[in-house]
Amino acid sequence: MAQFYSAKRRTTTRQIITVSVNDLDSFGQGVARHNGKTLFIPGLLPQENAEVTVTEDKKQYARAKVVRRLSDSPERETPRCPHFGVCGGCQQQHASVDLQQRSKSAALARLMKHEVSEVIADVPWGYRRRARLSLNYLPKTQQLQMGFRKAGSSDIVDVKQCPILVPQLEALLPKVRACLGSLQAMRHLGHVELVQATSGTLMILRHTAPLSSADREKLECFSHSEGLDLYLAPDSEILETVSGEMPWYDSNGLRLTFSPRDFIQVNAGVNQKMVARALEWLDVEPEDCVLDLFCGMGNFTLPLATQAASVVGVEGVPALVEKGQQNARLNGLQNVTFYHENLEEDVTKQPWAKNGFDKVLLDPARAGAAGVMQQIIKLEPIRIVYVSCNPATLARDSEALLKAGYTIARLAMLDMFPHTGHLESMVLFSRVK
């Protein structure tokens, strides 16, 4: 007769170890060494000692969590946000801005094997002009949650304030919560986006069921009382304008219109400085022909056109190409053309590329630009500026240019997202004569 035994659950007591942190990685984690292995510990800073327990043990590294901090770094700051440590938006509010910039610059320098020439930064607080807040109805309390996701979770942190938002948007948070929490459609709301443009404030509400006339009236009254442009999104394709006109923002002496769903850089201050520095690095001359790849709706293309003889912007999203053309007309720029192209194909064979380009700028998404590096090399530009939101793909793509005879002339860390683990950068490549 067979006998079955239930296995006893094995309990393990995690050992507490004492470590000294000697570095901060670009994600804001303290870095220590233990038994010859690198240990990553969120919440700790260089020059701090702590008792920790290992939570994940890999062959090359381990992760740990703090049990007790034994000393404080002189660069430790008191987080401004009461939600820090729970909300997944920020990872580094406990570190001084100077330390954040140094650690990100060091990580970038290691990846690129080149010294960081400068840090392009602006105000460290109140910089974010766009926010997407998740909404969730709680049946038990009949309350509406509004906030950001918890770190490593799909749960929502109900936020009352957010000091990295521009002041106009942060001040709106309790008012938006009160308005949305009074709607009959509370349980059918997906998320709300708030955008601060030069033209004013936008609110885009995603709802998953039709809104009653009473709810629509409440929302419209709210938009008028707060001076908002209101947009309703019943699905991912439809956007209904309830109040307001085409939004726009000022950038580098130009006026750029955009659709509420279009991508715009969330940090207006750093964006303006980044564009100005890119033009300076390219050393644009009045006779230059310039190519802007992954151009979007013309964040770099249009300012380039104010200095060059001609500029070509190439983008893979048709709606952004159309918006770029519209903004060129709006700003009276007749020396710039936008093209919709598949950037995985050889753009050097297109008619608009037959005369070549003196200078090239590219600003790809996180996946990088592996498919176009050889095409850029074929064009033989004198200077190339590569703007990156992913240092790993930047380092990979740079290898092609270095092998083709280009050198890194300048490398900047863009502090586009202070207090977070996001690292953006910009590189100037010059052709060796």
From Swiss-Prot:
Keyword flag Transmembrane helix: no
Domain TRAM stretches: 10-68
InterPro entries: 23S_rRNA_MeTrfase_RlmD (IPR001566), MeTrfase_TrmA_AS (IPR030390), MeTrfase_TrmA_CS (IPR030391), NA-bd_OB-fold (IPR012340), SAM-dependent_MTases_sf (IPR029063), TRAM_dom (IPR002792), U5_MeTrfase_fam (IPR010280)
Catalytic reactions on record: uridine(1939) in 23S rRNA + S-adenosyl-L-methionine = 5-methyluridine(1939) in 23S rRNA + S-adenosyl-L-homocysteine + H(+)
Alphabetically ordered keywords of this record: 4Fe-4S, Iron, Iron-sulfur, Metal-binding, Methyltransferase, rRNA processing, S-adenosyl-L-methionine, Transferase
Source species, domain of life: Bacteria
UniProt binding sites for S-adenosyl-L-methionine: 265, 294, 299, 315, 342, 363
Keyword S-adenosyl-L-methionine: yes
Binding residues annotated for [4Fe-4S] cluster, in chain numbering: 81, 87, 90, 162
PROSITE patterns: SAM_MT_RNA_M5U, TRAM, TRMA_1, TRMA_2
GO molecular function list: 4 iron, 4 sulfur cluster binding; iron ion binding; RNA binding; rRNA (uridine-C5-)-methyltransferase activity
GO BP term (any one): rRNA base methylation
Pfam name, any one: TRAM
EC number: 2.1.1.190
Catalytic residue list: 389 (nucleophile)
Function: Catalyzes the formation of 5-methyl-uridine at position 1939 (m5U1939) in 23S rRNA.
Family: Belongs to the class I-like SAM-binding methyltransferase superfamily. RNA M5U methyltransferase family. RlmD subfamily.
Name of the featured protein: 23S rRNA (uracil(1939)-C(5))-methyltransferase RlmD
Gene this protein is translated from: rlmD
